[in-house]
Amino acid sequence: SYGYDEKGGISVPGPMGPSGPRGLPGPPGPGPQGFQGPPGEPGEPGSSGPMGPRGPPGPPGKNGDDGEAGKPGRPGERGPPGPQGARGLPGTAGLPGMKGHRGFSGLDGAKGDAGPAGPKGEPGSPGENGAPGQMGPRGLPGERGRPGASGPAGARGNDGATGAAGPPGPTGPAGPPGFPGAVGAKGEAGPQGARGSEGPQGVRGEPGPPGPAGAAGPAGNPGADGQPGAKGANGAPGIAGAPGFPGARGPSGPQGPSGPPGPKGNSGEPGAPGSKGDTGAKGEPGPTGIQGPPGPAGEEGKRGARGEPGPTGLPGPPGERGGPGSRGFPGADGVAGPKGPAGERGSPGPAGPKGSPGEAGRPGEAGLPGAKGLTGSPGSPGPDGKTGPPGPAGQDGRPGPPGPPGARGQAGVMGFPGPKGAAGEPGKAGERGVPGPPGAVGPAGKDGEAGAQGPPGPAGPAGERGEQGPAGPGFQGLPGPAGPPGEAGKPGEQGVPGDLGAPGPSGARGERGFPGERGVQGPPGPAGPRGNGAPGNDGAKGDSQGAPGLQGMPGERGAAGLPGPKGDRGDAGPKGADGAPGKDGVRGLTGPIGPPGPAGAPGDKGESGPSGPAGPTGARGAPGDRGEPGPPGPAGFAGPPGADGQPGAKGEPGDAGAKGDAGPSGPAGPTGPPGPIGNVGAPGPKGARGSAGPPGATGFPGAAGRVGPPGPSGNAGPPGPPGPVGKEGGKGPRGETGPAGRPGEVGPPGPPGPGEKGSPGADGPAGAPGTPGPQGISGQRGVVGLPGQRGERGFPGLPGPSGEPGKQGPSGSSGERGPPGPVGPPGLAGPPGESGREGAPGAEGSPGRDGSPGPKGDRGETGPGPPGAPGAPGAPGPVGPAGKNGDRGETGPAGPAGPAGPAGARGPAGPQGPRGDKGETGEQGDRGIKGHRGFSGLQGPAGPPGSPGEQGPSGASGPAGPRGPPGSAGSPGKDGLNGLPGPIGPPGPRGRTGDAGPVGPPGPPGPPGPPGPP
């Protein structure tokens, strides 16, 4: 046969000798990269395998934002007025109570042993993106929960960002005048001067303080009247007096506006889980307060200014409950009126007999909204109530505007080459070329037998082949990013066949072979798009409450913008540096207070204000009528242990929830890099029972009962709606190294690098042995697949990027020398073959099974080590001109098997398995009697491992892949416009009078006084 030698000469066929060893493939040619072929037809989705074992729960997510508050309900019909009560005695104002600590969370149960893992199923095809759901109706407000027992104070949180400085407060009143300074020493009398000319009359000065009387001198002889002396020089200023006391503290200035929030800090590393504290001792129940008389029901009218509270009346007989009325529209919220003076506290009356609950009255028609009252002074916030049961999950909101394009992902792993097509017929011999220099090639082998034709894939539509341009003078560029798959081109017209014979007919498609052995783990793929995260477990309680901000005006909900058309994908630029936070906007001027507008849409929830002191414990009121059942509130934290209740009867089973429609499968994103293995979160609390009726109005807290024996477990209700998407958890600590993976098969040899072969270097010194890595947790052994048919050798990939130079390893043992082949005469290089026709792209192979993660081996020492495991396939190189198919040579003698390379790095996490079918609904149980809230149970012993579940049918499409890496930081936004002035806050409490300040410095000396009388 004809061919090229390494020097580029032509070889002519010589005498046929025995087959030499197969040469290495040459480096890639300098030709331009060919166009990407049309994508092949997608393969049939594989049937779903058995469900794998459930993974450990993820780390707890951060607490979600509180939901919007519901609109207040309408007041019921007014009951008959009770008799006028006697005026009570004035009560003393109670001291404000302290805010209670949050109650303990329930103790987590012990984690059960994991059951044996079922065989891993093949990943299901991704579903299409579902249409955006409509916004659900707004939930009604849940009833206020009772305050929980005080929990231990949380650890101090990190200091928040410093807010902008507020405006300076008003100047305080002037302090008291300082003490007068000490009198200076009397100066000596100067000599009498000559009489000066009389000057103009001076301004009369303020009288100075009288000086101390001097000692009486001896009486002198009366002298003659002398001339008036000249005006003496001003005396030296006296010694400064002691500083005065500080003035009284002025009233506190108005609170400045809250500064703009500081930039969000980086997420801290998750702390190690704290040790579980001991269960506290059960506290003694507090005394039951005296039940006060119920006040008369107010008449429903227009909401006006708040009047002074009237005297407390005696409890009247409970009226009959009216029938339900037609439900009116909720009126607009009026502004709270000014707080009236507190009425005198009456003496508590005797507790009346508890009346039977009346029938539910019909809610009255909604009154017209009253005029906007004046802003009242803020009341003291009450103790925090317990969080109510979770409300119904709202429907998915409208999709937001498209975000900025993400950063360019990593280059994907080169796909495996398709099956080799059938060998074409040999072309006609070319003209004999000029004999070149003798090459280093071995003798040509004799024609081998043609191998069995592999099953060709379904041929995709062949695109029109463009004319190949001349090779450019530049260097070969790096492979660009993979563009979006183009639409399949129309089948091109059959071209004129060249000198080459047409390829043989395609054989029938063979049956699907058994899965091959698990290959070596490839490098991690590019980052996938951001997936819809599953709800995380409740996170740990955050740091202590930060400083409260001012309550902002509720903004109007903006209309959802229409999603814009998808733009062309641009070239990914380098990741920019994090932009600096924008400048603080200038504070706008306070505008005039306008008339009350209509009820606005519910605004975003403002930041919680500072907790005020708890008010005094009020007298216990009479039991009220049973209210309408309210909607379920959000799920509360586990309260303190309650008294033992009576064993409840077996509850009724919940209604089986309807199975949701499977959403359309979204486009499959590229596999993201493996994230760090987070801590295994503690098992979350048991979900609330589904399909529970709305709770009634809040009753008075009863006395603590005894702890009863635990009742029988009720049947499990239907699963609740999925919770909101949890915030992204912090980066978890690195997991332990897994067991060593099996050595993979030796891959095809890569192309030789440019340059001549250098002489072998001297052996370096042997390095010290590395420290052994930590013992990994032994993984469960997967199902061993049947060995598949050995595939044909693929095309060699481009040389991958050079890795970090390894340390010098110990010199490998010399392999056994193979039998030397007979050296044949050097043949002349044959003429260059003509370009063959481009074959149709092969079918996409079925995805291989995930390899078991291997431990990361110790870094080897530098120097020539044993041959390593085959590297990951390089990026696809440019398509060179198709060469002429040569005759297949005989198989050369097998070389010595290289030692197994080190185990590859841990592969990316596999896709999430399909969701199993919903279990059958249990039989209906009897409705249980509502018992007292029991104590949170102590941690029970670990249960026995459960039996592996049976393989369910194919579930719905799995969720989207793991969240990709964060996109490049956007440029800082423009400075915001001046915001609307916020409402004038209520006046703050009057500050206390400050302590007297130090004595101020003495004032300047006054002008000299007028001369005294003679």
From Swiss-Prot:
Residues 9-22, 33-51, 113-129, 147-165, 213-252, 372-398, 407-426, 485-494, 608-622, 635-665, 691-707, 736-745, 757-769, 900-914, 948-981 have a biased composition (Low complexity). Residues 319-328 have a biased composition (Gly residues). Residues 1-1014 are annotated as: Disordered. Glycans are attached at residues 99, 930. Keywords: Extinct organism protein, Extracellular matrix, Glycoprotein, Hydroxylation, Phosphoprotein, Secreted. Residues 167-179, 819-829, 864-879, 999-1014 have a biased composition (Pro residues). Pfam families: Collagen. Expressed in bones. The modification 3-hydroxyproline is found at residues 709, 986, 1001, 1004, 1007. The modification Phosphoserine is found at residues 105, 611. The modification 4-hydroxyproline is found at residues 25, 28, 30, 39, 42, 45, 60, 75, 81, 90, 96, 123, 126, 132, 141, 147, 168, 177, 180, 207, 210, 222, 228, 237, 243, 246, 261, 270, 273, 285, 294, 309, 315, 324, 330, 348, 357, 363, 369, 378, 381, 390, 399, 405, 417, 426, 435, 438, 456, 473, 479, 485, 491, 497, 503, 515, 524, 535, 548, 554, 563, 581, 596, 602, 623, 629, 632, 641, 647, 674, 683, 695, 701, 710, 719, 722, 743, 752, 760, 769, 787, 796, 799, 805, 820, 826, 832, 841, 847, 867, 870, 873, 945, 948, 966, 981, 987, 1002, 1005, 1008, 1011, 1014. The keyword Secreted applies. The keyword Protease does not apply. Residues 63-77, 915-929 have a biased composition (Basic and acidic residues). Contains mostly 4-hydroxyproline. Proline residues at the third position of the tripeptide repeating unit (G-X-Y) are hydroxylated in some or all of the chains. It is found in: Secreted; Secreted, Extracellular space; Secreted, Extracellular space, Extracellular matrix. The modification 5-hydroxylysine is found at residues 99, 264, 339, 575, 686, 856, 918, 930. GO terms for cellular component: extracellular region. Belongs to the fibrillar collagen family. Type I collagen is a member of group I collagen (fibrillar forming collagen). Trimers of one alpha 2(I) and two alpha 1(I) chains. These protein fragments were extracted from an ancient rib bone collected at Bariloche in Argentina and estimated to be around 19050 years old. This is Collagen alpha-1(I) chain.
